[in-house]
Amino acid sequence: MPSVVGNLVVQNSNGSFNLGDFYNVSPKENTKAYNGSGASNVGFVVNTFNGVSATNTFDSDVADQDQIGTA
């Protein structure tokens, strides 16, 4: 099942996106999040008592961890 694809931009995808025939599906994901004090707490009842908090978002490197695809 051959297919011809022009310009394709996927902003956000969960799962896999297949075009045409495929042999091996290996989805990859990169995520970076900056959370302040108590920002990523999860649960039914969460009580946080935070004073003054500052999050450093300066990132001097180009890539944190490259994902290299293998065929």
UniProtKB/Swiss-Prot annotation:
Required for the formation of functionally normal spores. Could be involved in the establishment of normal spore coat structure and/or permeability, which allows the access of germinants to their receptor. The gene is gerPF. Keywords: Germination, Sporulation. InterPro entries: Spore_germination_GerPA. Pfam families: gerPA. The keyword Metal-binding does not apply. It comes from the Bacteria. It comes from Bacillus cereus. Belongs to the GerPA/GerPF family. GO terms for biological process: sporulation resulting in formation of a cellular spore. The keyword Ribosomal protein does not apply. Induction: Expression is sigma K-dependent and negatively regulated by GerE. This is Probable spore germination protein GerPF.
